[in-house]
Amino acid sequence: MHPKQLIPAEITELTSITNTDVADAPSAVEAVAALADFVGGCPVIAHNATFDRSFIESVKGGVNVSDIWIDSLALSRIALPRLASHKLSFMADLFGCDSVSHRANADVDALCGVWRVLLVALTDLPQGLMARLADMHPDVPWSYRPIFSFLAGQNPGSIFSLSAARADVLKADRADDRVDADELPVLKMPSREEIEADYAPGGLVNRMYPTYEPRDEQIAMALEVRDALVTGTHRVIEAGTGVGKSMAYLVPFAEAARRNNITVGIATKSNNLADQLMYHELPKLAEQLDGGLSFCALKGYDHYPCLRKLERMSRGQVEITTKRDPADTLTAVAVIMAYVCQSADGDLDSLGIRWRSVNRPDFTTASRECARRLCPFFPDKCLVHGARRRAAHADVVVTNHSLLFRNVAAEGRILPPIRHWVIDEAHSIEREARRQWARVVSADESRVLFERLGGSSTGALSQVSRDLATSEGSTLCLGLTAKATSTVARASMAIAGVFDGVRELGRRARGGYDNANLWIGPELRESDDWHDFLQSAYTGIDALEQADKSVDALVQAVAADKPEVVVDLGDISRRLHELAENLKLIIDGTDEHYVYSLQVNRRLRAGGESMTAERIDIGEALATEWLPEVHTAIFASATMTVSKSFEHFNHAVGLDRIGASTSSSLHLDSSYDFDSNMAVVVAGDIPDPRDRESYLTALERVLVDAHLAMGGSVLTLFTNRRDMEDLYARVEPKMARAGLELNCQQRNSSPRRLRDRFINEPTSSLFALKAFWEGFDASGETLRCVIIPKLPFSSPTDPLSCERNLREDRAWARYSLPEAVLEVKQAAGRLIRSSTDSGVLILADPRLVTKGYGKKFLTSLPTSSYQRIESAQIGHYLQLWRARHERRR
């Protein structure tokens, strides 16, 4: 059809369609009308049908093409869930079909070939599964139902058993048990000379990577890790960019696991690093080690499908809770069911499920929710406990910080007993531990909890009533159900009143843009507003306790004879109890281990309110609850020191509370030449940020000059949305006139899409917030300049800062200052990601010059090459810097 505009060059390159080809083509309306005549209301098969359908139906007459659209992309995920990719081009090549050329006829030919493969693959799924899928939730319109019904008719009478399917796929899934390192008097380890040989030319690492060149810093780190394992002590290692820290710890840790038949653990913050370990470094290491190396990734409970819930959903025994598109939930059931019938292990993350319209908790469980012995799939057939079992049989387990700290809170019931850990990206673990150990009372989560409880006609209480209705001798239990329904209804209303009070208290909060975060400190607790709030809070606590007692009484009574009936209700009862306990903790506020706060979303008239209790001293908790259980912990990161000192980090993780002889620290410089490749510019004459208009005007000039001088590829990192959006409105039009693209991290924008756009468009620049301060990698010409307008100190009204200031005289210098220094180091680290990268860091906060603490920021950076320049000269400086470095290439 005629596009009514010129075809972009990249589209012509992709499809070979030129402007000449479409010069006489019909209009969109004419083309869609012709398509409707051709289809004649028949079902339409399309790969990613949602895109095609929305595109066609946006044209006048498009809705007349067909009422039934079958998405072969979603169907391929059901038929072949284990494929590495479900792109049409990938499958066409894999199965020898016609190739995809992004031209209509060729792509249709390819889809026809793939379609036949999909139908055959569906018939290869376990007997009876097609009938199970065709019959589930018949009231929900679902385009795949006729296909499954037809295929089920080819094998009538077959009965599907998920339990049998899991037993069949698990036949070969056997492994040897590992020893708990607590049972070993000492670890058998390679000598220092053997470790050095692994990193020498022709050694183990060289065999993994033929172009590998030995690095003194990497060898020093590997030896330090080896010594820590031998002595059963801890290490804090700051390894600059380019040291190769992952290979430095992998080799000695792998040797420890293999030589002692134990499991060792690696915890990362980012998925990128975990994927690098799982799909690149560990497989290569396993290939080169005699006898191989077993490894697995272990994620949180909510990453794995719960087979009990899946079975009940497929049988129609539970309601579909989503209101958005119930058909997507049925598709999710089909995809997951096919996957678990073919895979001994695995998680939900790669299955392509549309979680925006599918309620994830309908398919997952949690540690406290898991039915365990009441579940027919526990433990061997379960994917959650199967993953834990495989982890206990592996040499190396890769997990994340979140799960590690959840395991600490659960007293070791989630992870296998691992006594030797690498905590990579360790600079962020204090924050993550605080988040995982927080006690939260949330309006949204409370609403979902009461929706799950339901009442006389919906939810778990209604389900129990229906299950008991046909049972003999159920009069007592039905009476308990009625009482529970009544107390739950009262509790739901009472807790709603609590959050109405929270929203009123939120009006007292100063600062914040969209979200108010208010410290529940002495001033608030002594106010009339708080005393007014206490009445509704105590009413809510009392109602929650009454509901908890009545639901628990029902669970206990029914569980005596029919425990399977109240599995879900038992979990909800525990959550109801937890809600009451957390609310009491926060309202009482006397436990000095916590700081208390409340949160309100100002953009919403209702909803989004919460109250939180966070652990203040994470180091104390780690020193008493985790480190005593661990023989060796290696804390590694590129950003740990403040002015060359580890004091702040050691306090944050509790190493300063367990004795000086149990740990030591090591700083390793980067193998990259930061002094030659990185420049730091301090804008010396920017007005004080407290004079906001003067500050923004001066900053606007710096931003415009910097972007024009660099020709794009600039990342500006803001500490607050208000400044960012104000400056974007001022700067973006000037960039557009200069032919430069400037994007901004708007409220609903996707960080991933912004990142991809920045990386793929060389002249693109970005204004961004917290998500981009760390973990954002864009090497080479993609990123040549990072600008930090304001030092990232925590807000004066931040509840944790307020609580620390109340308790300690020098809290700001002890906590807020070093935390800000480390954040700036992280941001600076975005610039140099390889030995050939170069870039400029611009610091536009006048406090670097006017305050004594400014030197701490500058002396903590990886280069000593910094200079103060008047803001009017920054553009000229960048032009000279750019010309000099381009000549060097």
Q: Where in the sequence are the language-model features?
A:
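A contiguous, basic/glycine-rich beta-loop/short-helix subdomain that forms a polymer-engagement track
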Residues: 361-397, 405, 410-412, 541-684, ...
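Signature of the SF2 helicase/ATPase Hel1-core->accessory helical subdomain module
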Residues: 275, 283, 367-396, 400-539, ...
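A substrate-engagement module of RecA-like helicase motors
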Residues: 4, 181-182, 195-203, 261-263, ...
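Acidic two-metal-ion nuclease catalytic site recognized across multiple nuclease folds
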Residues: 116-192
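Walker A/P-loop
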Residues: 230-252
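Conserved pre-motif I regulatory segment
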Residues: 189-237
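Conserved non-catalytic scaffold segment of RNase H-like nuclease domains
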Residues: 1-68, 81-102
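Conserved RecA-like P-loop NTPase helicase motor core
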Residues: 671, 683-694, 746-849
